[in-house]
């Protein structure tokens, strides 16, 4: 099993990173919370990974810390109805400490705010994970150097909308949420800040 990948960051979006190792470029699916901590393109990077094997595909998921990777695995293995896409959506909305706290406290309302997560799924997260949270540890920062800011303007708006659609939003709803976020944050807002504001 591939438990980590270390190489050069070729490019990144809020939900995906391309890491080059020994001449090979690996596509790694990541949550927004990991994307925020990536270094600039061209820098060395290490992601803690989990490979999901399907009959017709192999998908690599990466995280800033082993704790985040382990929690992702915990969700997809122990919570009924939660697959990789939904788990990534949850971890994009809530950082690990907040996620663990919500589960421990039975905060169904906060969990249900995650895109694509209804009240019943939020309740299952609490019931099935409450006794398991807290064992995954802290989530330290990942970047080996300061992250490069995403380009402001139309490109950031477009990338933020695409990320929300990938998280389960309808296209029109995603565009409206990003538009409101842009009005609140200003024209210089980065893709990551637009996504966080739209999800809040």
Curated annotation (Swiss-Prot):
Record localization: Cytoplasm
Domain of life of the organism encoding this protein: Bacteria
Entry keywords, A to Z: Cytoplasm, DNA damage, DNA recombination, DNA repair, DNA-binding
Residue stretches spanning the membrane: none
GO aspect biological process, one term: DNA recombination
Chain's role: The RuvA-RuvB-RuvC complex processes Holliday junction (HJ) DNA during genetic recombination and DNA repair, while the RuvA-RuvB complex plays an important role in the rescue of blocked DNA replication forks via replication fork reversal (RFR). RuvA specifically binds to HJ cruciform DNA, conferring on it an open structure. The RuvB hexamer acts as an ATP-dependent pump, pulling dsDNA into and through the RuvAB complex. HJ branch migration allows RuvC to scan DNA until it finds its consensus sequence, where it cleaves and resolves the cruciform DNA.
Family assignment from sequence similarity: Belongs to the RuvA family.
Protein name (database record): Holliday junction branch migration complex subunit RuvA
